């Protein structure tokens, strides 16, 4: 991983350690010291930084909660971080972010050490019924550190760890794919555009892992995740360009839902467009949905964009999207996420 403050290693949160607090003005630092002493702590000041030990995780949480509550009305902007027994320092954080970061030590450990694995959901070629790729979906690595992926990413965003988690997840997916998939099988991997503030810098570690594990860049498809709002189209275009210059494919997810519009598809011109389940569900019984899908396919064809129907849960849906001219399909009817990839072809026998 890189050593920048956005996606570099962060200190683990142990049972004992030392907080480091600071404020821009001397008066603010005096208020921090007064608060800590009033609470029975033993702060020491070194230059502009105030050091105060904690002797349990519960004490650490109480200390930050109390400091935030007491100084909220003072107008003092407090920043803080901590060091552990290995004397690892993290960059200074706003107090509100620090509070979130230490609120779930297990989530912090999961992110910092990459304590997760990935399940794979098959994607089929509708013309040949062959499994052409797998989408990688984050899952807990063990029952010791359990989590729901959505909750983990929500915590990461609030704790200013989104870039760390996104980078860890990308690299882990690539490593996982190298162990389980043959060359020529596409690997669909999610990414958060806002976590990649400088594509040429932030993606170095990703491309390094691709090379180290002997993965063909053309087998990779990086897709914008469903929860990510597209605020800066030019930035996303720059990310797509960086991926494509390296030989990697890109995809726009959840077309037809929220910010992922057909106009956005035409503007970004990804290699793949993934149509949201809201347009696929019971499309066999909805002529309006079918017409929307037809128009979407026509506009994608102009730009040579391969179209994938997501969320196929019924045979009838599969038949309709195939008839309409979709290239690819994915969903529970085809195959559920699994820790081991499905066979090389899909059959409706027994379904």
Q: How would you name each of these model-derived features?
A:
Residues 149, 158, 252-265, 318:
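Catalytic-site-adjacent helices and loops of nucleotide signaling machinery
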Residues 95-154, 337-338:
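Active-site core of bacterial EAL-family cyclic-dinucleotide phosphodiesterase domains
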Residues 123, 253-259, 306-315:
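Glycine-rich beta-to-alpha transition loops that act as phosphate-gripper elements at the mouths
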Residues 117, 135, 186-188, 219-223, ...:
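Structural preference for beta-strand elements that scaffold enzyme active sites
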Residues 1-90, 94-99, 130, 226-229, ...:
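EAL-family c-di-GMP phosphodiesterase catalytic domain
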Residues 163-235:
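Catalytic core of bacterial c-di-GMP phosphodiesterases, primarily the EAL and HD-GYP domains
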Residues 210-211, 237-249, 294-301, 322:
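Surface-exposed amphipathic alpha-helices with a cationic face
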Residues 129, 169, 173, 189, ...:
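Conserved, mostly hydrophobic/aromatic
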